[in-house]
């Protein structure tokens, strides 16, 4: 799913939300998540998963063209860890709704 598909699905799921507002909501959410990660914070969305940073230590690499050794500096990379509900849903239970998707009278 692309960002534009997510915006379209959000707008179709909530008829009172016009496409422009859905796009703004998605962009705002992604910007907030990017800002939090860039500041070193962890993001946890219950039932979905968590985003964090993993540290990649400095290492010696090789230039593929010349074969010479190159020092690759340490860096931090974004990492996603899926939550239990998402893992279960993806693992063969793709047709089952998440707990929050069920109608209240069905419980």
From Swiss-Prot:
Any GO BP: regulation of DNA-templated transcription
Source domain of life: Bacteria
InterPro entries linked: Hist_DNA-bd (IPR000119), IHF-like_DNA-bd_dom_sf (IPR010992), IHF_beta (IPR005685)
Keyword check for Secreted: no
Record's keyword annotation contains Nucleotide-binding: no
Region described as Disordered: spans on this chain: 55-107
GO cellular component, one term: chromosome
Pfam families documented for this protein: Bac_DNA_binding
GO molecular function: DNA binding; structural constituent of chromatin
Compositionally biased region (Basic and acidic residues): 65-101
Keywords: DNA recombination, DNA-binding, Transcription, Transcription regulation, Translation regulation
Xref: NCBIfam families: hip, PRK00199.1
Homology family: Belongs to the bacterial histone-like protein family.
Function: This protein is one of the two subunits of integration host factor, a specific DNA-binding protein that functions in genetic recombination as well as in transcriptional and translational control.
Record note on quaternary structure: Heterodimer of an alpha and a beta chain.
Name recorded for this polypeptide: Integration host factor subunit beta
Species annotation: Burkholderia mallei (strain ATCC 23344)
Lineage of the species this protein comes from: Bacteria, Pseudomonadati, Pseudomonadota, Betaproteobacteria, Burkholderiales
